[in-house]
């Protein structure tokens, strides 16, 4: 009995050593098994990294699609609310029920028009996000190339596990063959097991290369497409906000002008009742001693906003439109002012403008 137990123990130790050696060769347990085994290990590690990379990119693409879809749903609701507000503003403006002027009526109409334009721009942006961002990414997440590449990697992994199991079987039969003292049947089974292991290893190498190539191609497509779609999303949102800013700037100017109509005094008397504008010689000479209170010589130039339009009659008069800004250089006691607007200089009624201490830089640039 003791002899049998000792023999069984020796056999177990021998099989364990052989299994360890085979696992090193086929399981990547060491680098001393030759160039082919090192290449197989590198192939296996490369496939693992590619699999993780493509899976993470797929999840990120899916997150972008979900985020964009949620943004579209929320934005569509905002478009609906904004459109309703636009219609209400237009309705109030068109009914014109106010008995004390129509300033608010015009402001409501302007707001309704601008709000409709902004909601149209928002709708265009949401449409672009759907067609240019969500749809291409969704197509790639659900596309065949990614699934095919991942299936190849999974087949490779299963074949690798099968090769490891077959390597264990070869080790077991090798031990049995040594104990059988040349039994033909056992040797034949060993040769068959070794041939199967060789075929598995060859097929595993070929399949690993195919899977790595397919996954690398998918990874490259994922990186490029996702970056392009992110850039497209940024460009769409940027264009939307720029357009909305332009609409709001114009709307603000219109509404400020309407507010000034309420705050400003009634339109000044017609320039026809005023004396003609002085010549530049008179302004520089005769009037120099008469402008102690009204001349700008002592206080410098200043900017004025045009409250009422003025159409010049003579060559020395300056035509102005409501909302424009003019650099006032001289004011006479007769009610005339001299200044420059949009590169043109001339005289105009001083009562048609109002001095402004603070002016947007964009408005100042329009003066010259």
From Swiss-Prot:
The keyword rRNA-binding does not apply. It is found in: Cytoplasm; Cytoplasmic vesicle, Clathrin-coated vesicle; Cell membrane; Late endosome. Residues 1-21, 146-210 form a coiled coil. Highly expressed in seedlings. Detected in flowers, leaves and stems. CDD domains: BAR_SH3P_plant. Changing residue 189 to E: Reduced binding to PtdIns(3,4,5)P(3)-containing vesicles and lower capacity to mediate the tubulation of liposomes. Strongly impaired binding to PtdIns(3,4,5)P(3)-containing vesicles. One of its GO terms (molecular function) is ubiquitin binding. InterPro entries: AH/BAR_dom_sf, Endophilin_SH3RF, SH3-like_dom_sf, SH3_domain. One of its GO terms (biological process) is clathrin-dependent endocytosis. Residues 258-281 are annotated as: Disordered. The keyword Coiled coil applies. Keywords: Cell membrane, Coiled coil, Cytoplasm, Cytoplasmic vesicle, Endosome, Membrane, SH3 domain. Residues 299-358 form the SH3 domain. Residues 1-264 form the BAR domain. It is a peripheral membrane protein. Gene3D superfamilies: Arfaptin homology (AH) domain/BAR domain (1.20.1270.60), SH3 Domains (2.30.30.40). Disruption phenotype: Delayed germination, but almost normal growth after germination in sh3p2 partial mutants. RNAi plants exhibit cytokinesis-defective phenotypes associated with the aggregation of vesicles at the leading edge of the cell plate and abnormal cytosolic localization of DRP1A in dividing cells. Pfam families: SH3_9 (PF14604). GO terms for cellular component: autophagosome membrane; cell plate; clathrin-coated vesicle; cytosol; endosome; late endosome; nucleus; plasma membrane. Regulator for autophaosome formation and/or maturation. Binds phosphatidylinositol-phosphate; highest affinity for vesicles containing PtdIns(3,4,5)P(3), followed by those containing PtdIns(4,5)P(2) and PtdIns(3,4)P(2), with minimal binding to phosphatidylinositol monophosphates, including PtdIns(3)P. Together with DRP1A, converts the fused vesicles to tubular structures at the cell plate during cytokinesis. Knockdown of SH3P2 is developmentally lethal and significantly suppresses autophagosome formation. Homodimer. Interacts with FREE1. Interacts (via SH3 domain) with ATG8E and ATG8F. Component of a phosphoinositide 3-kinase (PI3K) complex containing ATG6, SH3P2 and FREE1. Binds to SH3P3 and DRP1A. Forms a complex made of SH3P2 and DRP1A and triggers its accumulation at the cell plate. The N-terminal BAR domain is required for the interaction with FREE1. This is SH3 domain-containing protein 2. It comes from Arabidopsis thaliana (Mouse-ear cress). The gene is SH3P2.
């Amino acid at each position: 009995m003791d002899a049998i137990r000792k023999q069984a123990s020796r056999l177990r130790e021998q099989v364990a050593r052989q299994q360890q050696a085979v696992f090193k060769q086929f399981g990547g347990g060491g680098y001393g098994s030759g160039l082919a085994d090192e290449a197989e290990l590198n192939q296996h590690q490369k496939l693992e990294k590619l699999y993780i990379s493509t899976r993470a990119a797929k999840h990120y693409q899916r997150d972008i699609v979900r985020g964009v879809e949620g943004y579209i749903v929320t934005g569509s609701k905002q478009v609906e609310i904004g459109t309703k507000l636009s219609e209400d503003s237009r309705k109030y403006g068109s009914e014109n029920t106010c008995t004390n002027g129509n300033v608010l009526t015009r402001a409501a109409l302007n707001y309704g028009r601008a709000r409709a334009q902004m909601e149209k721009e928002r709708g265009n942006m949401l449409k672009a996000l759907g067609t240019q961002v969500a749809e291409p990414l969704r197509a790639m997440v659900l596309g065949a190339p990614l699934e095919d590449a991942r299936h190849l990697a999974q087949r490779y992994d299963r074949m690798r596990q099968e090769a490891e199991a077959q390597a264990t079987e070869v080790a077991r039969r090798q031990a049995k063959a040594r104990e059988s003292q040349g039994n033909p049947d056992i040797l034949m089974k060993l040769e068959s097991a070794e041939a199967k292991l060789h075929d598995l290893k060859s097929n595993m190498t070929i399949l690993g290369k195919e899977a790595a190539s397919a996954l690398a191609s998918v990874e490259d497509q994922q990186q490029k497409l996702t970056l392009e779609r992110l850039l497209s999303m940024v460009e769409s949102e940027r264009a939307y906000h720029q357009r909305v800013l332009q609409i709001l700037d114009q709307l603000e100017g219109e509404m400020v002008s309407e507010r000034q109509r309420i705050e400003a005094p009634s339109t000044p008397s017609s320039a026809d009742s005023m004396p003609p504008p002085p010549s530049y010689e008179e302004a520089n000479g005769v009037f120099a001693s008469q402008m102690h209170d009204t001349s700008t010589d002592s206080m410098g130039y200043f900017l004025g906003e045009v409250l009422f339009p003025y159409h010049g009659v003579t060559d020395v008069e300056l035509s102005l439109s409501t909302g424009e800004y003019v650099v006032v250089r001289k004011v006479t006691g007769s009610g005339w002012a001299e200044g420059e607007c949009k590169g043109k200089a001339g005289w105009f009624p001083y009562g048609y403008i109002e001095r402004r201490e603070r002016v947007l830089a964009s408005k100042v640039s329009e003066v010259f």
